[in-house]
């Protein structure tokens, strides 16, 4: 594993931040040089909350790249989709700034995990979806799913979008932290999605995030 990977989710609040932190921690433990980035953080002022969570899970302090703003190039105060948060803050989202920051991180680290906002179809600007940006940059995707009710539908829609846009799925991460309280639903979601991943993206990895992994 080497290069830049885009971490997206099948929905909002699916566990992307925790999953990104845990994956980075595991890579660190394997001796990899890894950093996480939150290119667009909304609902914050000066520091990206998600980056702070990543560092806590990774067990490391804020890095020099964090202090330089490379891991959090765009921060908006209103907690909403990037296109709306930017509009309400009265300024445009700077895609060149984001691209440059990611490139600088990629030059310094072996692996860069880029955590997106929400799912693949979230608008970054009025004219650009997250999935458009991923395709433009050529990033493989790490997709976060779960065992909660509705996850099968949302995951298959995400699969269809990735195929339509010709984007490589690196791995599907099944997040047990958001499992349904109904054990039948959670287990069936796991079994079904594991089979569909093999059919739809045979080269993609299946990963599971246990409830204790983020502790």
Curated annotation (Swiss-Prot):
| Protein name, UniProt field | ATP-dependent dethiobiotin synthetase BioD
Keyword list, A-Z: ATP-binding, Biotin biosynthesis, Cytoplasm, Ligase, Magnesium, Metal-binding, Nucleotide-binding
Report the SUPFAM superfamilies cross-referenced here. P-loop containing nucleoside triphosphate hydrolases
Q: Where does substrate bind?
A: 42
What's a single GO CC term here? cytosol
Q: Which reactions appear under catalytic activity for this entry? A: (7R,8S)-7,8-diammoniononanoate + CO2 + ATP = (4R,5S)-dethiobiotin + ADP + phosphate + 3 H(+)
Which sites bind Mg(2+)?
Answer: 17, 50, 115
A GO molecular function term, named singly, is: dethiobiotin synthase activity
Is Transferase one of the keywords UniProt gives this record? no
Q: Where are the transmembrane segments?
A: none
Recorded superkingdom: Bacteria
Query: Which family does the record claim for this protein?
Result: Belongs to the dethiobiotin synthetase family.
Q: In which pathway does it act?
A: Cofactor biosynthesis; biotin biosynthesis; biotin from 7,8-diaminononanoate: step 1/2
State whether it acts alone or in a complex, and with which partners, per the record. Answer: Homodimer.
One Pfam short name: AAA_26
Catalytic activity, EC: 6.3.3.3
What are its GO biological-process terms?
biotin biosynthetic process
InterPro entries in UniProt? DTB_synth_BioD, P-loop_NTPase
PANTHER family linked = ATP-DEPENDENT DETHIOBIOTIN SYNTHETASE BIOD 2, DETHIOBIOTIN SYNTHETASE
Main subcellular localization, coarse class? cytoplasm
* Catalytic residues as annotated in Swiss-Prot or TrEMBL: 38
Top-tier EC class: ligase
CC cofactor: Mg(2+)
């Amino acid at each position: 594993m080497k290069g830049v990977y885009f971490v997206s989710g099948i929905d909002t609040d699916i566990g992307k931040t925790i999953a990104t932190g845990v994956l980075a921690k595991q890579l660190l433990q394997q001796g990899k040089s890894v950093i996480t980035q939150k290119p667009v953080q909304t609902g914050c002022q000066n520091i990206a909350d998600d980056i702070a969570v990543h560092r806590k899970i990774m067990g490391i302090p804020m890095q020099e790249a964090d202090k330089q703003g490379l891991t959090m190039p765009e921060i908006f105060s209103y907690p909403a989709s990037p296109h709306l948060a930017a509009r309400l803050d009265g300024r445009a989202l700077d895609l060149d700034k984001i691209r440059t920051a990611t490139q600088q991180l990629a030059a310094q680290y072996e692996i860069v995990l880029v955590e997106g906002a929400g799912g693949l179809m979230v608008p970054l600007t009025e004219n650009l979806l997250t999935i458009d940006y991923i395709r433009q940059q050529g990033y493989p995707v790490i997709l976060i799913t779960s065992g909660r009710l509705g996850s099968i539908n949302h995951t298959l829609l995400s699969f269809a979008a990735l195929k339509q846009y010709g984007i490589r799925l690196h791995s599907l991460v099944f997040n047990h932290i958001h499992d349904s309280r109904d054990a039948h639903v959670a287990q069936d979601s796991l079994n079904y999605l594991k089979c569909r991943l093999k059919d739809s993206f045979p080269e993609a990895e299946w990963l599971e995030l246990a409830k204790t992994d983020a502790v």
